[in-house]
Regions:
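Phosphate-binding active sites in nucleotide-utilizing proteins
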Residues: 105-116, 122-138, 142-156
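Charged, low-complexity C-terminal accessory regions
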Residues: 429-460, 467-469
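A short helix-turn-beta junction within AAA+ P-loop NTPase domains corresponding to the substrate/partner-engaging
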Residues: 151-155, 390-403
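H-loop/switch region of ABC-family ATPase nucleotide-binding domains
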Residues: 379
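Conserved H-loop
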Residues: 383-386, 394
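Conserved AAA+ ATPase core "coupling" helix
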Residues: 161-169, 408-417
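P-loop NTPase motor domains
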Residues: 32-89, 95, 139, 144, ...
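Accessory regions of macromolecular translocation/handling assemblies
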Residues: 1-50, 87-118, 122-123, 130, ...
């Protein structure tokens, strides 16, 4: 009816005005207006002149729910397929001409596929000869199949493991490439730098350590290395009998013996005793693993309670030393469930162990670019990341973010951080496993992550798919037995 038509016109006019848009009725030019909006390329010149306006490209981009429909770097790794145009999404985060840094953050709720996506990226980086380190604080067994298949090194850090990383070891680094580039040799005390790192380790082990004990611990550490002939003179590190390597390094047991000599340091020695003579004495050994492999997984999932942040520190310390060797080589450090190490950001409390560790992790994210590397963190604790100074710092220095499925309240937090549109947030809350949004360089693209059948078999955590793999292997073993 005419009344109904007039009501609809009124509603459309009211809606446009609410959006700060002007609306005019094409009186006596309805036919030209209809032909102009149809895909006939017959835009009426008079209507165009009456309605045209200048617009910034940023304003024009806001008319679209996603600001980019293409992401295909020349030498990148394949992540998946663009959901909007089925083009391949290929990203080279190490291309410094395109990306300010190679850091990446994966966000998603439990079961969204963070571990699957993280391993998929890590495997494809490895196939491009990028050195990959993965630190797994939870469910480390999920990384074992892929690691074994690609010929990687799987290192288990736990009280029950025979493998050990000596936290007191000063590792000899291959700095030949850096010296050729810079033409200078670093004369800073290597021992002083190592002791500084050990202070973080003991702060994690003894959260209530006070200022006096810190000073006494510092003296004990210097004495421990002095007994092995190591001083602040870097030349003292060289083994006289084997000039191509360093001297034998002290163990935690050597530190323990010195701490137990004095009543003022005996309390620290008693706490350290668990790692020397107690159930976790596996930490009191010389390093018996190698990090030369291009794909290294450090599993600390069997560490619980106060040993978990200690184990993460040991793993990060070892990997970080290796990552700084050659600035010309690509390398990536993956930290799954990074919040386990970052913790609180209250640095005003000197006894806050997680604050010290969080500051250290944030520093890695900030400066790893200078060593040709990337730091990748995966977490589902988005609220804590948003509230924490360290969490915000990591988000700010990660140029690339991958957002998997999120609950609506978590998605709204991400929206305020990454300035996503309502359409993008709606997509995030409806993502199925294997789908995500990549945000980088102001581009936002929805992607279906694609894995080959072999990759899926190596990294899947789905119960039904694991059961299918089990049945296939049992059938294969039965067939081999019959032969």
């Amino acid at each position: 009816t005419l009344e109904n038509l007039e009501w609809r016109i009124s509603e459309v006019r009211r809606l446009m005005i609410s959006q700060d848009m002007d609306i005019r009725i094409c009186r006596f030019r309805q036919e030209q207006a209809l032909l102009s909006i149809l895909p006939f390329c017959k835009l009426d010149k008079k209507l165009f002149e009456a309605s045209k306006r200048n617009m910034l490209t940023s304003s024009a981009a806001s008319c679209y729910p996603f600001t980019s429909f293409e992401m295909s770097d020349e030498n990148g790794i394949l992540l998946g397929v663009n959901q909007h145009n089925n083009s391949l999404v290929i990203v080279d985060i190490f291309n410094s001409r395109v990306y300010k840094n190679a850091n990446m953050v994966l966000l998603g709720t439990s079961g969204a596929g963070k571990t699957f996506t993280l391993q998929l990226i890590a495997l494809r980086m490895r196939r491009k000869s990028t050195q990959v380190f993965i630190i797994a604080p939870l469910k480390g067994h999920e990384f074992l199949r892929a690691c074994n298949n690609i010929g990687g090194e799987f290192i288990s850090i736990s009280p029950a493991s025979k493998q050990c990383i000596n936290v007191c070891e000063i590792r000899k680094q291959d700095l030949s490439a850096n010296q050729l580039i810079d033409g200078v040799v670093n004369e800073n005390s290597i021992l002083a730098k190592k002791i500084q790192q050990l202070h973080i380790f003991f702060s994690l082990l003894i959260p209530d350590i006070n200022h006096e004990e810190r000073q006494l611990l510092d003296e004990a550490l210097i004495r421990t290395y002095a007994k092995k002939g190591i001083t602040h003179n870097n030349e003292s590190l060289i083994d006289p009998d084997h000039p191509d390597r360093y001297r034998e390094m002290p163990l935690l047991g050597d530190v323990y013996e010195i701490l137990m000599e004095s009543p003022e340091t005996k309390r620290m020695g008693n706490i350290l005793n668990r790692l020397v003579n107690g159930s976790a004495k596996t930490f009191n050994q010389h390093t018996n693993v190698q990090l030369d492999n291009l794909y290294t997984v450090l599993d600390i999932s069997e560490l619980t309670g106060e040993l978990l942040p200690v184990g993460m520190f040991v793993a990060l310390d070892y990997v970080w030393d290796k990552a700084k060797e050659d600035r010309t080589k690509e390398k990536a450090i993956f930290i799954d469930e990074a919040w386990e190490l970052i913790g609180d950001d209250d640095t005003s409390n000197p006894n806050n162990a997680k604050a010290l560790a969080g500051e250290w992790v944030q520093e890695i994210f900030k400066i790893i670019r200078g060593y040709g590397g990337a730091a990748v963190a995966a977490t589902q604790d988005i609220g804590d990341l948003d509230r924490s100074r360290f969490g915000k710092g990591i988000l700010n220095v990660a140029k690339t973010k991958i957002i998997l499925n999120l609950e609506e309240d978590e998605a709204r937090r991400v929206q305020s951080i990454l300035h996503l549109s309502d359409a993008e947030i709606m997509s995030i809350t409806r993502f199925e496993r294997g789908q995500g949004l990549i945000s980088t360089n102001s581009n936002h693209i929805t992607v279906s992550f694609k894995a080959s059948p072999l990759e899926k078999q190596l990294i899947t955590t789905d119960r039904m798919e694991l059961n299918q793999i089990l049945q296939e292997k049992m059938a294969q073993n039965a067939h081999n037995a019959d032969l």
